UniProtKB/Swiss-Prot annotation:
Mg(2+) binds at residues 71, 144. One of its GO terms (biological process) is 'de novo' CTP biosynthetic process. InterPro entries: Class_I_gatase-like, CTP_synthase, CTP_synthase_N, GATASE, GATase1_CTP_Synthase, P-loop_NTPase. Gene3D superfamilies: 3.40.50.880, P-loop containing nucleotide triphosphate hydrolases. Its EC number is 6.3.4.2. Allosterically activated by GTP, when glutamine is the substrate; GTP has no effect on the reaction when ammonia is the substrate. The allosteric effector GTP functions by stabilizing the protein conformation that binds the tetrahedral intermediate(s) formed during glutamine hydrolysis. Inhibited by the product CTP, via allosteric rather than competitive inhibition. This is CTP synthase. Catalyzes the ATP-dependent amination of UTP to CTP with either L-glutamine or ammonia as the source of nitrogen. Regulates intracellular CTP levels through interactions with the four ribonucleotide triphosphates. It comes from Acidovorax ebreus (strain TPSY). The keyword Metal-binding applies. Pathway: Pyrimidine metabolism; CTP biosynthesis via de novo pathway; CTP from UDP: step 2/2. ATP binds at residues 14-19, 71. Homotetramer. Keywords: ATP-binding, Glutamine amidotransferase, Ligase, Magnesium, Metal-binding, Nucleotide-binding, Pyrimidine biosynthesis.
Length: 552
């Protein structure tokens, strides 16, 4: 039978519920259990696909094409289970499902209410995420309830998990509550009052936490733990300290040493071998003992919020570990870069990366960045839009197509080398179509797709004969211009098998040591254990580029 752990948060948001949930899952997995994670988001958007990265951070894409919360990226990087559409749902998706049922008459004329109809639907979605009744069923499903206890948006979710816990019966569910202990510098002490109040609020709803994860700047003293235990009705060994660390990969060991996994296994009556966290210890050692450092310039438009490029940041760090170097990432605003100042802004970096994005703001700066990298033979990796700007730059300055652009930025440009895809086939064989009037939400080319890779290319040395990666885009290299670009020397090294859409462009080794653009998002498949072949090759190229510069 699948057991459930419900993770809630209090006092403030952004405490790290996603990391805490993923860390607990990783420890339980190391005990030999099959684990999955489910993220419940209280906002009314159907999914985060149309939300601004400034509002929400990165949109993480799964193999089955779901646009999900960035926490699912943490989940995939921490545990072996792959995430799917069912692992993330929102208030919007719940209400959409309830209203569709009401229109079909599934409720037999009853008045549709939050309790029981919405709360029942939430419970069904949770069970679906846990794979109950399917071959994907797990031993433990960890459900992270987004938002903060006390938010009006979270109430239906908290009521739903309370009801589900009751239905599951004793020893089949546990509650973990993440809270915050502020440090008052003037008084020189940690304050427990906000934690007392947030647990009081949770208990009013009918939920008694089994464990409290207390986020603080430093470890929580024992006398404070005793006080928290007394006022929250949580056993003292269930009051667990979560202090700030320099790498998230230290969190599993931190929680294990304070007995969180033992407490959960006892509560859920799970008889397992002891946790083996050796690979996490090795990972932490690798991050703390680099043999060098490389400087990477990431040129984008959402640079004020690093969460907008969370998976790219992590993939670069993973690749650094594979090459035993520390990767120092500098986020540069593409709006500040021009052909005239590109050298001044970019000369000190060992490699340049242009990540994905949407809209025309800052795009000319990205084109200038691609030009600088090409002309100065700096290793360049373009992802999604980064591949498109590299194509536009090459068309303008090498292929002689003056005025080349994307129809996303200029609908009437003279040479639309990048244009809207109107038809493509999904991995399951269904043909999707769209036009300029299609809704923004859910109309992109999404999820895992496979392409053939041309032998003798840089891409082939990285991927082999076939590349399967996740996509999230509406625009694509225009097939009508491929021959002109090839004639001018651009290598189209991977094409999709059915539509012959461009997946990878690159420059020959004789022209540039390492210059590649990919239409897909490789960052979503990077893991701390092996990195990702494309990012690993990129960081190796950065290390190589550093050598002559270091000698000089």
């Amino acid at each position: 039978m699948t057991k459930f752990v419900f993770v809630t948060g209090g006092v403030v948001s952004s405490l790290g519920k996603g990391i805490a949930s993923a860390s607990l899952a990783a420890i339980l997995e190391s005990r030999g259990l099959k684990v999955t994670l489910i993220k419940l988001d209280p906002y009314i958007n159907v999914d985060p696909g149309t939300m601004s990265p400034f509002q929400h951070g990165e949109v993480f894409v799964t193999d089955d094409g779901a646009e999900t919360d960035l926490d699912l990226g943490h989940y995939e990087r921490f545990i072996e289970t792959r995430m799917k559409q069912a692992n993330n749902f929102t208030t919007g998706r719940i209400y959409q499902s309830v209203l569709e049922k009401e229109r079909r008459g599934d409720y037999l004329g009853k008045t549709v209410q939050v309790i029981p109809h919405v709360t029942n639907e939430i419970q069904e979605f949770i069970k679906r995420g846990a794979g109950i009744g399917t071959p994907d069923a797990v031993d433990v499903a960890i459900c992270e309830v987004g938002g903060t206890v006390g938010d009006i948006e979270s109430l239906p979710f908290l009521e739903a998990v309370r009801q589900l816990s009751l239905k599951l019966g004793p020893n089949n569910s546990a509650f973990v509550h993440l809270t915050y202990l502020p440090w008052i510098a003037a008084a020189g002490e940690l304050k427990t009052k906000p934690t007392q109040h947030t647990v009081q609020k949770l208990r009013e709803i009918g939920i008694q936490p089994d464990a409290l994860l207390c986020r603080a700047l430093h470890a929580v003293p024992e006398e404070e733990k005793e006080k928290i235990s007394l006022f929250t009705n949580v056993a003292e060994w269930g009051v667990i300290s979560m202090w700030d660390v320099d790498t998230i990969y230290k969190v599993p060991r931190m929680l294990h040493e304070q007995g969180l996994d033992g407490l959960i296994c006892d509560k859920l009556r799970l008889n397992t071998p002891p946790a083996n966290l050796k690979r996490w210890d090795d990972l932490v050692y690798e991050t703390e003992h680099p043999r060098g450092e490389v400087q990477i310039a990431m040129v984008g438009k959402y640079v004020e919020l690093s969460d907008a490029y969370k998976s790219v940041n992590e993939a670069l760090k993973h690749a650094g570990m594979q090459s035993h170097v520390r990767v120092k990432i500098t986020h540069l605003d593409s709006e500040t870069i021009t052909d005239d100042n590109a050298a001044q802004q970019l000369a000190q970096y060992d490699a340049i990366l242009v990540p994905g994005g949407f809209g025309s703001r800052g795009v000319e700066g990205k084109i200038s960045t691609a030009r600088y990298a090409r002309e100065h033979k700096v290793p360049y990796l373009g992802i999604c839009l980064g591949m498109q700007v590299a194509t536009i730059e090459y068309a303008r300055h090498v292929a002689g197509l003056a005025g080349a652009n994307s129809t996303e930025f200029d609908a009437h440009c003279k040479h639309p080398v990048i244009a809207l895809i109107t038809e493509w086939k999904d991995e399951d064989g269904t043909i999707k179509t769209r036009d300029a009037n299609s809704d923004l939400g859910g109309t992109m080319r999404l999820g895992a797709q496979s392409s053939d890779v041309q032998p003798g290319t840089l891409a082939h040395s990285i991927y082999g004969d076939v590349v399967t990666e996740r996509h999230r885009h509406r625009y694509e290299a225009n097939v009508q211009y491929l021959d002109k670009l090839r004639t001018a020397g651009l290598v189209i090294s991977a094409l999709t098998q059915r539509e012959h859409l461009t997946e990878i462009v690159e420059l020959p080794k004789s022209v540039h040591p390492w210059y590649i653009g990919v239409q897909f998002h490789p960052e979503f498949k990077s893991t701390p254990w092996s990195g990702h072949p494309l990012f690993n090759a990129f960081i190796k190229a950065a290390v190589e580029h550093q050598k002559p510069a270091a000698k000089a």
